[in-house]
């Protein structure tokens, strides 16, 4: 599932290609879903009419998951061995779905790259009241008072106004909503109750990921802290979690191992990249694709690897480094 802060993004980015996976016996399906105001606008009156509102983008993802579950066998796939995988907002989406009763029966492994729905000082979800406050401000910017009036405006106008909204809410004004339908409760409550999908997880960060507090080590905040916290909760449920850190600086860049830089390697699509990739880069990509596809096939990344990738435990913490 692609990222983009729930505001933009698409499923056909250059990194997303399944050739390397297919060579190792894995079928890749990339999906599109509604984003921005079209995917995550919550309206209380709409909820009263339909029974739900605010998670249209997540419902798209669930519909795609249902289609894959029903049809993947026709492509040679196994509907009883589906791995959900996402990066950034795509990882947050994937994480939400591992808490959703609408999706968990169809998910057998989860890969969360640089994203967790609980990855900040507070969960990256809105309560209905918080979501409605954002919606009310958006209606004000658009000069309307209801969702019916909003629907009469051109889509281009809505996107322009959403850009204005983002100046008022710089940290993801559109995000998943705790609606009691897709998401039964807040992720922190569900995690404490053991309400996550009881499956293997593979999750991690890049060395220079986003959202790091000023002056703090990347291991003191943001995505990393969330990954460790969730891993500890999973261990209490005897669920295997494999943690990693991507530390490889991309060639031709001074930005280090920045947010999303690992995608070329986890998909094995270096030949599509404009950067001056070396033999070292290709070897790293092969290692990561091997680990990722091994996890997809058996819930364990250790098939045909040189060094064992140990699961996380509170007593013996292990983080796999890709450098």
Language model region names:
Residues 34-37, 85-89, 244-253, 307-314:
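Short, solvent-exposed turn/loop segments enriched in Gly/Ser/Thr/Pro and often Arg
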Residues 67, 292, 309-312:
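Signature tryptophan residues that serve as conserved aromatic anchors
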Residues 109, 117-124, 141, 145, ...:
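Substrate-gating cap/lid region and adjacent catalytic-acid/histidine neighborhood
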Residues 302-323:
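Mature extracytoplasmic/periplasmic domains
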Residues 1-144, 191-211, 234-236:
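Serine-hydrolase-like catalytic core of hydrolytic proteins
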Residues 21, 99-103, 252-258, 311-312:
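Short glycine-biased active-site loop of nucleotidyltransferases that positions the nucleotide triphosphate
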